[in-house]
Amino acid sequence: SLGGLYALHLTKHVDIAGAVSISTPFAGSWTADWARFFVPTYQLFREVGRRSIPIKEAQAINLNIDWTQIVSTKGNVPYHGGQNDGVCTIKSMKSRKDMELIEVPHTHFEVLCSDLVVKIILDRYKKLIQRKKNTNTI
């Protein structure tokens, strides 16, 4: 999930033809906002809070590439500040309007073992390759 945030930041430095992110909390984490006070030395909580610098900078990045965000919708732990997949809120995962959003009925952990997710990723890769063949560019 955090790989999607890293990839988004990389778009400022590297030409990227397209991307698929999985359960990325692009708007940050409400849980991290309060958890960082209980574990102040845990860097993850400081970096993924809703008002953290990495999250705010990510929100300012405008995408002009094909990007698919897979949104995991099952789990729903009660202390995450809204409907969630056990780790990230669905609202945070769906916060970007410049991406294709695809919901899958999995928890944050199941999503990585999903045949459906593999199919989505391979489909997006095939479309990218086909576009390259048709236009001789990516």
Predicted regions span which residues?
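C-terminal catalytic-base region of ester-bond hydrolases, centering on the histidine
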Residues: 62-138
